[in-house]
Amino acid sequence: MKTKTILKTILMCLGVSAMSFATHIKDVQAVTEVYGDGEKLSTVILTYDQMIKGDSVSKDDYSVPNRTVKKAYVNNTAQKSNTSKKRGKYVIVELEELPLEDTSMDMNPQDEEERKKRNEKGVSGPTLGGKGNAKPLENITAQITQKGTVVTSNGKKYGADSTVLNSSNTRQLVIEDFVQLTFTDKDGKTLMYNLYKPKNYNPQKKYPLVVFMHDAGAVSSEHKYTLSQGNGATAWASPEWQKKHESFVLAPQYEVVTVNDKYEYGPELD
C-alpha cells in the first residue's frame, strides 16, 4: 500500500501537464512540399484525443526546431485549410517557407574525384555514363513542442510541456500522387519512371502528356529523386494546375548521365 502511495506522489510531482501532453497528442505527422530547390518540411499535423477549440490555438503555442511557425489552427481533417474550424481533433501547424538553397556547389566525394580527372584531360561538364552528383534522398521528419495551453471543446485545458515529440510518418504532397514504374525494352534494358494520372481520369477522353526530364545533377538510382530534387515535374501535377489543365505527367529517372556538353548521348536516351 505504501509503495502505491509513494508512486502516486512521485507521478504527481512530475507534473500533470507532462503526462496529459504525452497522452492527449496521439500522433504527429510531417508533411512535405516540393519547391524550386527541392522537397522540404512545410507542415506538422497533430492529432489530439479530444476536439480542440479553434479559438484556443495560436502559432505561439507550438515550436519546431530551426523553423518559424507561420500559423496554427484547428481542422476536422488531417490537412491544411484556408480557415480554422470552430473545433476539431487536428491542429495544423504551418511553417514559413525556407530561403532558396544554392546546391550548385554540392558534390559527392566520388564526383569530386571525377571532376579532377576531367579537368586534367581538359574536359568540362558531366561525363557520359557518369553517376552525376546527386545526394541520397533525405528522409524528412518533424519535431514539435507544445509551449502553450490549448482547450478542448468541453473546457479541459491541455497545458504546455517541454517534451519534444517526433513525427511517426511523413506525407509527401503531390509526390505521393505519382506511381513508380519501370520500362524494359526488348534487349532487357530498363528505365525507371514516375507517372501521374489525372485523378478524374476518363478513358473516353484524350489528355495531354507532360514529360519532365531532369538534368545531370539529378542522376540517381533512387526512383523518386527527380520528384524530390525540384518542382519541375510536380508543378504540373499540382492541384492548382490540374484543376485548369488535366494531364498525365511523366518523369523518367536516369541512373547515369545520358547527354554531355558536346551533345553526345548514350543508348539510354533512346
Describe every region a protein language model picked out.
Residues 1-10:
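Bacterial N-terminal signal peptides that target proteins for export
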Residues 3, 182-185, 197-199, 215-217, ...:
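Short, flexible loop/turn elements at secondary-structure junctions
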Residues 9-18:
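Bacterial N-terminal signal peptides
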Residues 22-45, 66-207:
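A domain-start/cap signature at the N-terminus of enzymes
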Residues 40-57:
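A short glycine/threonine-centered beta-strand motif
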Residues 50, 97, 253-256:
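A mature extracytoplasmic/lumenal domain signature
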Residues 209, 213-269:
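Active-site machinery of serine-nucleophile hydrolases
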